[in-house]
Structure formats: C-alpha cells, structure tokens
Amino acid sequence: YFTDLAIAEVKRIENLISDWIPTTQISLVNKNAGIQAVRVDSEVYELVERAIKISQLTEGAFDISYASMDKIWKFDGSMTVMPTEVAIKKSVAKIGYKNIILNKEDQTIFLKLEGMKLGLGGIGQGYIADKVKTVLLTNGCSSGIVNVSGDINAWGKQSNQKPWTVGIVNPMNKNKVFATFPLENSSVETSGNYEKYVIFNGIRYSHIIDPRTGYPATGIVSVSVFAKQTEIADALATGIFVLGVEVGLDLVNQLKGIECIIVDDKGKIHSSKGIDIKKYTK
C-alpha cells in the first residue's frame, strides 16, 4: 500500500517537473523561452522560486538553467582533447538564473533567452523524496526511509527501535565506509564524481560542471550534505561540489541546521563545524 502511494507520488511530480517529458509544465516553460511567460501550478512555481534562492546563496554554482548548456564535455571515454576555450564559453552562454523571470501575481515563469532551458534534476530528486515522505506520513506510515537515486530521507526508527543510519564512503579508498551517521528525521544527499570523470594534463575533471564557467568542477570527489529537507541537501551538494572545499564549508557553516562532509581529490576528509567526525568514524 505504502509502495503504491510512493510510486504514484513520484509519477505525479515527474509529470509536472521533468524536462525530458514533453508535456510537463517545465517543458512548456522551456518551449516558450524567449517567447512568452507560462502560467504554472503553485507547486512548480514555488519549487523554481526556492531553486533560485539556492542559486543566490551559492552565487550561481547551483543553477536550474544549467539544462541550457551545450554538452561539449564527454565522460564516456570518447573525448581525447579538451574543448576549446571559445566552445566552453559558448556552451554556457544561455545559462543564468537571473534570466528566469518569475511573476508572483500571475504565477508565471518566463525564460528571457531563446534556447534557455530549466532542468530540475539537481533539486527535483530531493523534492520527490520530501514529498514521498509527506504522503507516507500523512497516510499513517510512522517510520520509513526513502531513497531517490541517492537522495535519502528517513523518519521514525527501524523495527529494532534504533535510528536509521547512513554510511559515508571515501571513493579514494576503495569505497570503504569511513563514518556511519544516525539519520533522525533528517536527510542526506551525496554527490560524487568518482564514477564519471576525465583526466587532462594530470587534472581530474568531474562530470559536475560549473554553470558559471563551463568548466568541470575540480578538487572534490564527494560531497554529503545533511539537512532536514532532502531538497536543500540535493541542491546544496551540487553547489558545494562546484564551489570547492573552502568556500563550500564556509557557506555551510553559516547555514543553520545544515552540515556537510567533503572528500577532496587527495582523499582527505573535511567536515563542517557541527559534525564531530571522530564520533562517527569507524
């Protein structure tokens, strides 16, 4: 019963916000880029509004208009030379959350530039995890854990009355779990580049691309963000990955109720102020 409810909710949201389903409201917004504003449901409007707030917070390191990017980097081994600087610059010309125009009164979204596109992948999975939890809680599911491709939201306790736990791995050390954290009515999202990357001149370029420059993020192999809402953890993990270790930690340390663990490309582990990593390390 709960599984059916969860699946129905996932489908409902996908049919609202997926940019790869041509009939969704987000696809309609994308089709009308540079042409006209599109009225959307309040749910879609508010999600986009929150996404823009995270763009402001991360100074554009997280940006839902990243879907406008030309896919010039290939991470399947087929790319033998680095793209040119001109191509890289051109690839991000249409990205920019400041060109997403929201009109609260009409509840419309307008993309200023023709060819601009929204993609809610970096926040949508977290949003789905939160909404599934809400649906299950409302229908009497007093404890559970939802995992939407790595975005995890847990509430209540396991059947043995112990809290749910999540293991954090170090990708640079044979994916060994180095710390286990209890998840008590909270969520975690891990973003990693250890599966998809290319190396040029000894620099490891990850598949997570900085929407501001068009260059892949470097310096980090994994980011785990803990927050009450999976949506926030999801978007911030991407943003921190792009911002890098110092700026990323600095940002998280200013945010209430949010913590993170970063593994850099040397395998070193960094954590935000509120996490005493020694307490949870194996």
Tell where the protein language model's regions lie, with residue ranges.
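Mature catalytic core of soluble alpha/beta enzymes
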Residues: Y1-K282
